[in-house]
């Protein structure tokens, strides 16, 4: 007896091909009709007229037969399409009864199904999302917190199954007179494959002097997955912004998640969340950017997460940038995370925020692992228009073998004192000392930081290093003699750091030594009517070296601020430099510089430079810099924080195994940056959170990046959450769409949560879930935002393809938002996604 099988996807493809063929034939027939159905006679005689009539009749008969054939063709294609759909429906119907009793048994005995998604927590209750099926399933999203005097906490996202994404944390509830509710924590990723859930955004606070809610922590990663991104801090138009949530810890081989951005507040920005710790073999996560303020001080950037204990060269996370303030002081940059216990480089310190009255201090670079690794570069100090610039951060200490970190440049001032540069770290056994950071221009100008000493066995001193012992001085003289021929022929030494660009000139930093050495910091741009552009950081040494930090853009006293310089690239081993911050401008803030690319084999990609605000919001802010590209194993760098009216920077792309970087957060109603795309085998980066605004519209969340083409189980990045609109009659920002999973085996990223709104307003629409690969779950739709009058709607959810569950529909926002419908299951096995609540 013979057996016949039907593949619905093959039937559907054949129907599509036949429909295309039908269109081509119809077009050809139509083109021929005019020349074959009404021929002109060759002459006026009867024979010519008869010949023309004969051939015209043949043409008309052909057209009539073609019309009948076309009708039959259309009926055949319709029957084929219907047959494919019937086969698919029959397969799904046959599978569902088989799964139902199995799932019922597991539900009764364990509280979760074998295959299927966890349920969403109901909006306005703060209920936790249910865990996904033990084998295949996404965790449900946490319910949003209740509105009240103090906002209620959002529910935690449910954990993914063995294969599945963790659910997003619920948004914190709105507070009428007290503190906004805390966002729920993201759910843990599936133990084998899947993405960790994003922390929920904190709730906003409406009363004078109140504080926005803290963002929820990102979920922990699975075996290969990175930790989830922390939720954005809640905003307030009359108080202090909430702190961003901490990034989740990475799985065994995963990196820590990026900390959430601090919330906007009139009287003080919220602190950025700390980056998550890397898994045992993973890199640390980047700290979140501090929130923007208008009257007081911007929020401090979050600290970078530490790399895993046994990480083989993975770096600690970079510190987050401090929040800016167009009328007050800038926030301090976060300190860089430390490298692994034995191996790994320290993370770069965060650049500080720009401030009208005073610039914030740059964050210190992280220290390296005990044996091998470079110290992290110190963050640049922030510039100021009226007061003193911010002090540069100190460079981090290296391992026994490795270069010390450069000190950060001091911030410049248009009408006050320039700040001192940060001190460079000192080498230990083999490695160069770090350059001292250049002082900022001003009246008076800041002093340069002290350079670090070279290693006791081999290594050049950093620039501006103090005098040392006679033996060490002799060592430096010998190295100078060795370097002279190479320096004369190529313009760079064999061993040693490149020189810093001169402050106030926008000169590029010099390249590091051909063997090993850090690139010099770019000089900050000149202060003038229009600020000058900052110089690019120098490239690291070919074998080993950190790229120099890009110079900050100059201050524009009557016009536009200067553009920050590009961070220097590392070559084989080393981290890329941080992009320079844009300069303050009276009319327009300067754009941030792009982060430097990571070393091919080891090292972290540089963070994009933050964009500058214009003084007192007279004009627009600059565009934030994009993160640098990762190496073979490193993730792309995070995008910089956006300026007023300008989007956050795009996350850098992975190269081979690395994930895309997180998009930068928007500021004051600007959109978040898109997450970077994963490398060939990497996951997509999470989109940046949209900026909250005291105006009419919150910024839209950035789209999640797509996973790599050959990613095995990696997920598309989650969409960023929409920003809150605090003004009466405003509308919350739209959540970003989730990124697509790998083409063969990958999960769609979850859509971002829509932004909340104030009195007489509407919540933002949740983002669409990302599409799955042939094997994998569709991404969950984002929840609609809270609306005092009308809650935001949820968006569409992709279906699974062959094996996997459809994504859950997102919840509608509290106060009448429309929930989304769940996606359909895969053709072979899987469960339909659950409808939103």
From Swiss-Prot:
One Pfam family named in its UniProt record: PE
Cited InterPro entries: PE-PGRS_N
Repeat in keyword set: yes
Composition-biased stretches (Gly residues): 811-825
Region of interest called Disordered, as start-end residue ranges on this chain: 811-837
Induction: Expressed in both low and standard phosphate concentrations.
Start-end of Low complexity biased regions: 826-837
Domain PE: 4-94
Keywords: Repeat
Family assignment from sequence similarity: Belongs to the mycobacterial PE family. PGRS subfamily.
Official protein name in the record: PE-PGRS family protein PE_PGRS4
Record organism: Mycobacterium tuberculosis (strain ATCC 25618 / H37Rv)
Gene assigned in the entry: PE_PGRS4
């Amino acid at each position: 007896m013979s057996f016949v099988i039907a593949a619905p996807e093959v039937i559907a493809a054949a129907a599509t091909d036949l429909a295309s063929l039908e269109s081509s034939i119809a077009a050809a027939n139509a083109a021929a009709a005019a020349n074959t159905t009404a021929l002109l006679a060759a002459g006026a005689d009867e024979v010519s007229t008869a010949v023309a009539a004969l051939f015209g009749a043949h043409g008309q008969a052909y057209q009539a037969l073609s019309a009948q054939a076309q009708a039959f063709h259309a009926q055949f294609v319709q029957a084929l399409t219907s047959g494919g759909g019937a086969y698919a429906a029959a397969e799904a119907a046959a599978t569902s009864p088989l799964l139902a009793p199995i799932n019922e048994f597991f539900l009764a005995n364990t509280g979760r199904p074998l295959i299927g998604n966890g349920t969403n927590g109901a909006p306005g209750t703060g209920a936790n999302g249910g865990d996904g099926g033990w084998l295949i399933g996404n965790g449900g999203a946490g319910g949003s917190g209740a509105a009240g005097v103090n906002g209620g906490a959002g529910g935690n996202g449910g954990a993914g199954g063995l294969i599945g994404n963790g659910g997003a944390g619920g948004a914190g509830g709105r507070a009428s007179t007290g503190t906004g509710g805390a966002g729920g924590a993201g759910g843990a990723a599936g133990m084998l494959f899947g993405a960790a859930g994003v922390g929920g955004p904190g709730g906003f606070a409406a009363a004078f002097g109140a504080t926005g809610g803290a963002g929820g922590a990102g979920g922990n990663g699975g075996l290969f997955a990175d930790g989830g991104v922390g939720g954005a801090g809640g905003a307030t138009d009359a108080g202090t912004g909430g702190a961003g949530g901490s990034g989740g810890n990475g799985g065994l081989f995963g990196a820590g998640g990026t900390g959430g951005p601090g919330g906007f507040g009139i009287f003080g920005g919220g602190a950025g969340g700390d980056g998550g710790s890397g898994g045992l073999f993973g890199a640390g996560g980047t700290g979140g950017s501090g929130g923007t303020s208008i009257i007081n001080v911007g929020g401090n950037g979050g600290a970078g997460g530490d790399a895993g204990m046994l990480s083989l060269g993975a770096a600690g996370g970079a510190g987050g940038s401090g929040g800016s303030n167009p009328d007050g002081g800038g926030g301090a940059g976060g300190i860089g995370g430390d490298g692994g216990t034995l191996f790994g480089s320290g993370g770069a310190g965060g650049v500080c925020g720009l401030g009208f009255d005073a610039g914030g201090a740059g964050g210190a670079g992280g220290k390296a692992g005990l044996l091998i690794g470079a110290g992290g570069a110190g963050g640049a100090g922030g510039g100021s228009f009226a007061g003193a610039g911010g002090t540069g951060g100190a460079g981090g200490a290296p391992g026994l073998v490795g270069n010390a970190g450069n000190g950060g440049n001091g911030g410049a001032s248009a009408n006050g004192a320039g700040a001192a540069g940060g001190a460079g770290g000192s080498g230990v056994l083999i490695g160069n000392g770090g350059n001292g950071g250049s002082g900022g221009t001003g009246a008076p100008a800041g002093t340069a930081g002290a350079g670090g000493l070279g290693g006791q066995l081999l290594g050049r001193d950093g620039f501006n290093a103090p005098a040392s012992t006679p033996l060490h001085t002799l060592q430096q003289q010998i190295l100078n003699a060795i370097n002279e021929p190479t320096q004369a022929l190529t313009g760079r030494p064999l061993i040693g750091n490149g020189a810093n660009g001169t402050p106030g000139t926008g000169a590029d930093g010099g390249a590091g030594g051909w063997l090993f050495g850090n690139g010099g910091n770019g000089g900050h741009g000149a202060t003038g009517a229009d600020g000058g552009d900052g110089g690019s950081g120098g490239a690291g040494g070919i074998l080993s070296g950190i790229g120099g930090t890009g110079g900050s853009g100059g201050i524009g006293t009557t016009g536009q601020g200067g553009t920050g310089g590009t961070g220097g690239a590392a070559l084989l081993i080393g981290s890329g430099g941080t992009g320079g911050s844009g300069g303050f401008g009276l009319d327009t803030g300067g754009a941030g510089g792009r982060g430097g690319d990571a070393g091919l084999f080891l090292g972290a990609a540089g963070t994009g430079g933050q964009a500058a605000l214009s003084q007192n919001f007279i004009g627009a802010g600059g565009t934030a810099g994009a993160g640098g590209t990762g190496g073979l194993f490193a993730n792309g760098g995070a995008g910089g924080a956006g300026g007023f009216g300008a989007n956050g920077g795009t996350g850098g792309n992975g190269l081979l195994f690395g994930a895309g970087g997180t998009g930068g957060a928007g500021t004051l109603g600007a959109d978040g940056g898109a997450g970077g795309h994963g490398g060939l085998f990497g996951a997509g980066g999470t989109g940046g959170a949209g900026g909250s605004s005291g105006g009419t519209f919150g910024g839209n969340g950035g789209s999640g990046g797509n996973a790599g083409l050959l990613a095995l189980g990696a997920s598309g990045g989650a969409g960023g959450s929409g920003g809150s609109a605090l003004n009466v009659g405003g509308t919350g920002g739209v959540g970003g769409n989730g990124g697509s999973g790998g083409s063969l085996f990958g999960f769609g990223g979850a859509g971002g949560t829509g932004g909340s709104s104030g009195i007489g307003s509407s919540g933002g629409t949740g983002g669409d879930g990302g599409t799955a690969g042939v094997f994998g779950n569709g991404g969950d739709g984002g929840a609609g935002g809270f609306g005092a009058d009308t809650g935001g709607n949820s968006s569409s959810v992709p279906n699974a393809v062959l094996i996997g569950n459809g994504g859950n529909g997102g919840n509608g926002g509290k106060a009448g938002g429309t929930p989304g419908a769940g996606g359909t299951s895969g053709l072979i096995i899987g469960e339909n996604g659950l409808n939103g609540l």
